[in-house]
Structure formats: structure tokens, C-alpha cells
């Protein structure tokens, strides 16, 4: 399964790169190089903190990318864990497959607003009280940090979303509510989209509400 999943995700990254080259070849990406460096620096710091501080870091855990295993990983902080007793009682203690159909809540935070408010020093960056004001107060205080989207997203498969989402969702259980940080190349990459600049790390709150269709492992020898 891992081999097939790696092949699928690698293909998805290639497709994203192909689309970016064909749709955005008139864009001067040198205009975004400083922004790219800022996003890389933040990811480097977060990975360093997580590695050295473990559960004392604000983002306490990472997920190794199947598509880019040697690069920066997605990071996450558990807001609310799944209720293990209830999940076991209804025999749904599983995580999605790449082909599963899901329902979820998510909040996407504006990358530039987050960047402007992230602390510079290590102690503040890993202080939950300080960091929570960036990611939680914003839902009620638009002047602190305006959430870009608050959406109940349903009836989609892992394969239909950005690579970072696909990889994170396959580690979540129903009821898990996480704050996640996704490196730009596992998000919208160099191309960006209509509302996200190129080279933008993305920050989400993600809650897996249900797995409406479990799907299954990608078959070996599928040719993908």
C-alpha cells in the first residue's frame, strides 16, 4: 500500500507542477522569492523546535510525507482527540484510505496574517497562550486574525485535495480536531491560486467528522 500511495502522491505532485508551468508561465516568481525564504525559515524553525522540544513544542508532531519524504513535513497540534471509547463501541476506530470519501470541518487561516503575527523568539513561539491567540481568538476577533474560510466540506476523497491534506487525513480518526501547518510545496506550491500567493505555507484547523465511504488500499500493480 505504501508503495502504491507513494506512486500516487508523487504523480499528483508532478501533475501540480505541470499545471503550474502551463497556467502561470507569465508570472515573475522572483517577486515572491523573499516570501518563499520567509516561509522556508518558519518551517525550518518549527521542525527544529519539534525535534528538540517534542511535546513541549507548540506543534508537537509531524507526518512524514510519502510524496516528499526527505523534505519538510506537515506539523500538527491536537486540539481535541477522537473519543476512543465511542469509536471502538461503533467499530469505527480506523483512519481513512487515499480513496476514502470524507466529511470534515476546516478553517483556513490567511498565510500573510499568520506570518505577520508569529513570534520571533523560541520561547514565545512555543508558548500555547501566545500562539493560541493567533489561531483561536481569530474566529471571534477579525481584527486579530481574520479566518479566510470556515467551511463544512463533505463528499470528497483524499485524492481530490492538496497533497498535505491527503497525507494528514490518512492519520486522523473520526472526531480528531487538529491545528496543522503544511509546507508550501505540499500545498499550492509555486503556482499558488486565486487567493493564495505562491510559496505560501498553509495553516488549518481540521476536524474529521465522518468517513462516509471507507474505500481501500490502492491495488498493487494498478499501473499508477
Residue spans of the language-model regions?
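Sec-dependent bacterial lipoprotein signal peptides
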Residues: 1-21
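Cross-family detector of peptidyl-prolyl cis-trans isomerase
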Residues: 5, 21-224
Amino acid at each position: 500500500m505504501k508503495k502504491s500511495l507513494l506512486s500516487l502522491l508523487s504523480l499528483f505532485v508532478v501533475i501540480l507542477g505541470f499545471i503550474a508551468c502551463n497556467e502561470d508561465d507569465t508570472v515573475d516568481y522572483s517577486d515572491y522569492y523573499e516570501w518563499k525564504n520567509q516561509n522556508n525559515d518558519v518551517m525550518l524553525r518549527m521542525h527544529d523546535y519539534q525535534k528538540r522540544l517534542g511535546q513541549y513544542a507548540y506543534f508537537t508532531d509531524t507526518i512524514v510525507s510519502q510524496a516528499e519524504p526527505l523534505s519538510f513535513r506537515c506539523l500538527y497540534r491536537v486540539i481535541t482527540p477522537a473519543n476512543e471509547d465511542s469509536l471502538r463501541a461503533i467499530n469505527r476506530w480506523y483512519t481513512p484510505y487515499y480513496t476514502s470519501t470524507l466529511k470534515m470541518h476546516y478553517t483556513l487561516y490567511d498565510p500573510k496574517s499568520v506570518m505577520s503575527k508569529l513570534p520571533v523568539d523560541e520561547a514565545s513561539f512555543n508558548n500555547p497562550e501566545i500562539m493560541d491567540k493567533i489561531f483561536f481568538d481569530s474566529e471571534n476577533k477579525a481584527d486579530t486574525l481574520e479566518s479566510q474560510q470556515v467551511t463544512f466540506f463533505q463528499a470528497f476523497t483524499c485524492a481530490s485535495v492538496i497533497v498535505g491534506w491527503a497525507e494528514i487525513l490518512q492519520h486522523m480518526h473520526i472526531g480528531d480536531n487538529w491545528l496543522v501547518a503544511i509546507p508550501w510545496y505540499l500545498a499550492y506550491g509555486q503556482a499558488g491560486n486565486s487567493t493564495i500567493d505562491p510559496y505560501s505555507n498553509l495553516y488549518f484547523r481540521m476536524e474529521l467528522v465522518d468517513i462516509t465511504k471507507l474505500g481501500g488500499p490502492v491495488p498493487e500493480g494498478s499501473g499508477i
